[in-house]
A protein has these predicted regions:
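Beta1/beta-strand and adjacent pyrophosphate-binding region of the FAD-binding site
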Residues: 12-28, 44
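Glycine-rich FAD pyrophosphate-binding loop
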Residues: 21, 37-58
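Glycine-rich Rossmann-fold phosphate-binding loop(s) that bind the pyrophosphate
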Residues: 24-26, 48, 142
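Conserved Rossmann-like nucleotide-cofactor binding loop
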Residues: 28, 51, 207
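N-terminal FAD cofactor-binding segment of flavoenzymes
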Residues: 53-115
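Flavin (FAD/FMN) cofactor-binding and adjacent substrate-gating region
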Residues: 93-144
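Predominantly flavin-linked oxidoreductase catalytic cores and closely associated redox partners
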Residues: 141, 147-306, 372
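FAD/FMN-dependent oxidoreductases across multiple families
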Residues: 262, 266, 284-378
Length: 378
């Protein structure tokens, strides 16, 4: 994404005003910016980091595909329509990385034991979501897909600023106007950018905007699901041929693959470029580290075989110092979260910022896009 440089106005220049400031240029923030800009709205799209960047929340569903197709038709976004199924995606955007997802596959693993092919009828499950490859769902390599959608938003007229976050914001309820100070990660205090916006959209994810004075604390105590994860992107993950049987309706690797353990489960999402997203999900009481991930894999022989040639390639920059180029797995102690409110005077949160439960069954993309649908039509 080619980010523009906004400067603070001089004494004789007016402060630049936008209809919408969208904080967060992930897929949901960028998709909303694309729609709004295509309808002639002035949109400022900011993000604290830069594209392309690592992210999870990578597996689509029939509901997500339906909503993408609906948005493409509803708002005349012909460039969006191919993302609604794997066949059209590969035909029109081979450079935007995805993976084939025919459905969901589940395999039970016992500690210290190989998966027994003779027990697969009772110890595995395949759930078909499409009848053929061409119409299948997709896994999204978010570094590629998010950048594509952000670029589409910019081409439609949105103004992008990267490596920048909101430093302070004040809402005038009488004018229905935000006065916002933006601070670049590369700037020192005193070089802030001043802008105004009618609406502030929170698409930042778990960070939220409470740090700038919006009273919207977390309210997660009631949630029954309390899980955390350790995850990353690997090359060299082997196919799970050990679990293939002739009567399978599709290959279990062409799916959101769930390896079910006694203590939790491991996801595997295979992209067409040889990268596989792998993550271990367990209750919040479990240990959370890269070493714990590998110990769990090694204690399940069939998983150890799958990962014997695997090499971690992302994320990069989590290890201190931040400039370190060595990849290290991301660790989240608790993924399940919820904010008190989804909206307030002059601001709205997209679902990605309001709350999240768990990656099980791949609900995240569809949930986020449903919020885009609602806001675009509001």
């Amino acid at each position: 994404m080619h980010a523009v440089e906004l400067s603070s106005p001089s004494v004789n220049q007016p402060i630049r005003r936008f209809d919408f400031l969208i904080a967060g240029s992930g897929f949901s923030g960028s998709l909303l910016a694309w729609i709004l800009a295509s309808q002639g709205r002035s949109v400022l799209l900011i993000d604290r980091s830069r594209h392309p960047r690592f992210a999870v929340g990578e597996s689509s569903t029939p509901t997500a595909d339906f909503l993408l197709a609906y948005l493409a038709e509803r708002w005349g976004l012909k460039q969006l329509a191919p993302l609604a199924c794997w066949g059209q995606w590969k035909k029109h955007y081979p450079h935007v990385v995805c993976g084939k997802k025919r459905g969901f596959s589940y395999y039970h693993h016992s500690h210290g034991r190989e998966v027994d092919p003779s027990s697969l009828e009772t110890q595995s499950l395949l759930v078909a979501a499409s009848s053929q490859d061409a119409w299948s769902d997709t896994h999204w390599l978010r570094s590629s897909v998010d950048e594509f959608l952000a670029n589409q938003a910019c081409s439609a007229g949105a103004t992008p600023i990267e490596s920048t976050q909101i430093h302070s914001a004040l809402f005038d309820p009488f004018e229905h106007r935000w006065s916002i100070s933006l601070r670049s990660a590369n700037e020192t205090p005193g070089a802030d950018i001043q802008v105004q916006a009618t609406w502030l959209i929170d698409a930042t994810g778990h960070q939220g905007l409470s740090s700038i004075g919006i009273d919207n604390p977390e309210d997660s105590h009631w949630m029954r699901t309390r899980t955390g994860a350790v995850y990353g992107h690997f090359v060299g993950v082997d196919p799970f041929t050990q679990a293939a049987i002739p009567q399978d309706p599709f290959c279990g690797d062409d799916a959101a693959q769930h390896h079910v353990l006694d203590t939790g489960w491991i996801w595997m999402l295979r992209f067409d470029n040889g990268v596989t997203s792998v993550g271990l999900v367990e209750p919040t009481s479990a240990a959370r580290s890269q070493d714990h991930f590998w110990k769990t894999v090694q204690s399940h022989p069939s998983l150890a075989r799958l990962m014997r040639n695997a090499k971690l390639v992302a994320p990069i920059g989590l290890k201190q110092p931040a400039t370190c180029s060595e990849p290290v797995m991301a660790c989240v102690d608790r993924m399940s979260r919820c904010r008190t409110r989804a909206w307030g005077p002059g601001w709205v949160s997209l679902p990605v910022s309001y709350g999240f439960i768990d990656p099980l069954h791949s609900t995240g993309i569809a949930h986020s896009i449903s919020g885009v649908v609602r806001l675009a039509e509001a």
